[in-house]
Amino acid sequence: MSAFNNKRNFFRIAKEKSLSFLILLLASCTSIPVTNRSGKEDTQTVFKAEESYIRPYHHLPDGTFRNPEGSIERDDYEFPWFKFTKERMSIKVKVPEGHAIPKDEVLPSLTALENEDTITWIGHVTFLIRIGGKTIITDPFFSPNAGPLALGPRRFVDPAIKLSELPKTDLLLLTHNHYDHLDSEATKNFPHKKTKVLCPLKLSKFYKDYRFKDVNEMDWYQEKQVDDLKVTFLPAVHWSKRELLDRNRTLWGSYLIEYQRKKILFCCDTASGEVYKKLGQEYGPIDIAFINIGAYEPVEIMKYSHANPAEALEIGRNLRAKKVIGMHWGTILMSLEDPFEPPTKFIANAKNFGYDEKDAVLFKIGETKTIKQILS
């Protein structure tokens, strides 16, 4: 086939895919549910390769996954996509002074505390966590938009550092496959491909295709020892989708990191749910819990997948978390609330859930705090 025909086919395919992506965008890039996929069957014995096993509740017979038992179930509400998108795009974002620290201060502050256990907010859900001599990165999102190609909600604040400036990382934690968490370009250009990756079931191929060397899929309640760290993958009330027909075909979840006597929980995007009382009973008390506090309006659709600030604090209380770090705000416009409303409501609601204001922890983008400082 000639080069001309190759090029023509490429643009034809790209055009077809772009049309699909436009439809996909509202469903997956903004993390908004589309239809009700909640099953009602109980855990049961099924047969596979002539061997029987007990299928966990969150595993469905068709190979997809569902939320923990007792979670809020989506109805078949027909969401006004175009009205939502128009309203979201009409929001004018004014970034408050001091929301991000100067970029030339980010790496020096990290270096100055290199012998301490620290947490640094890169933006949105991307953090660097240094604990037990290991550097962990969570849901690396560095692209200018959350979506395929150049589509999807765009950042209004840049990452605290460039991807190329990222310090050597030992462990990458991925919670789920939405575009504001699983960033194709960041994955492709990640500078440390020897980093150990922990990801939910059915997502390892994504990393292997980009030549990561050590990729490990995890199911809920599975544990992984990473030298002196113990990491446990735990449930969350969310969903997954990246393409038109792949709803809930990959798992989602949170990571509990244990080192010596400290416990840090990095939550997947989540709605409130009874599961957090159970997790608190089994795994609590937890020293620090990272919980999403943004992207909760309009409530009639966001309530199925994103907690609001008060619900985030309720989740923290149910987990028996001593400190709650508010994340998933102040970086990208994904919903209809004022993008700087979440932290105000987060602090204002702290006492309603048994926390002092200092227990509801907020970062500036690029800021580094020591874990000792957070827990004091």
Regions found by a protein language model. Give the residues of each.
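Catalytic core of the metallo-beta-lactamase
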Residues: 126-132, 225-286, 303, 307-311
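Bacterial N-terminal signal peptides that target proteins for export
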Residues: 6-19
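Active-site metal-binding loops of divalent metal-dependent hydrolases
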Residues: 140-142, 177, 236-237, 268-270, ...
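Divalent metal-coordination and catalytic microenvironments
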Residues: 129, 139, 176, 183, ...
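Cap/insert and terminal regions of metallo-dependent hydrolase folds
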Residues: 30-35, 41-47, 51-63, 68, ...
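Active-site metal-binding motif and surrounding structural segment of the metallo-beta-lactamase
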Residues: 151-198, 214, 284-290, 294
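Metallo-beta-lactamase
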Residues: 29-153, 157-163, 199-266, 287-294, 345-367, 371-375, ...
